[in-house]
């Protein structure tokens, strides 16, 4: 299982937890990695939110539990040398999708629709059962109410956002390419 490019260059550890017998089926491998501060959290000004978390490992775990109906049972946090760490299982069942043969627009649309339904289903059942009090209401119901208040405007809003986001991503990529090609990124 990959640990994400945000963790590149940081220490991480894989730990084998031996099960109750010699059978491999009851062994578990967990990883511990340093949790990073997301860019958006630097702009959070509400002291109640900022002070809610012990460290970035704690924030990451609480967020994952709130977003996933069936979070990893080994999901947790700890601290090593004063740095917040994320703890999770290295799943023996996790596999990447093989996108190599997916080139037909109709097949792509069907896969995207299936992935969207799976993601929505996983997320929609999660926040009420997270066991945390940071958000004292059901985000699912709040989102549903916001959409219901202007159902006709929802799809155009998403389309406008997607186009704006795409334009920003392309512009950012162009800036990166210009800097990279002109040797203006130290260390690369």
Describe each model-derived feature in a short phrase.
Residues 1-188:
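Conserved ATP-binding subdomain of kinase catalytic cores across diverse folds
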């Amino acid at each position: 299982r990959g640990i994400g490019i945000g963790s590149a260059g940081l220490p991480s550890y894989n730990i084998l937890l031996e099960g109750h017998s010699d059978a491999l089926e009851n062994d578990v491998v967990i990883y511990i990695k340093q949790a990073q501060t997301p860019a958006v959290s630097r702009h959070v000004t509400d002291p109640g939110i900022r002070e809610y978390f012990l460290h970035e490992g704690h924030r990451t775990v609480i967020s994952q539990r709130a977003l996933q109906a069936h979070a990893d049972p080994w999901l947790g946090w700890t601290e090593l040398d004063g740095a917040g760490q994320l703890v999770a299982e290295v799943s023996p069942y996790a596999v990447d999708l093989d996108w190599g043969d997916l080139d037909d627009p109709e097949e792509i649309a069907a896969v995207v629709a299936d992935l969207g339904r799976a993601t929505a289903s996983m997320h929609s059942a999660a926040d009420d059962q997270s066991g945390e009090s940071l958000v004292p209401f059901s985000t699912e119901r709040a989102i549903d109410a916001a959409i219901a208040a202007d159902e006709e405007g929802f799809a155009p809003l998403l389309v406008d956002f997607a186009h704006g986001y795409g334009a920003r991503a392309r512009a950012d990529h162009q800036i990166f390419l210009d800097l990279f090609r002109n040797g203006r990124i130290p260390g690369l």
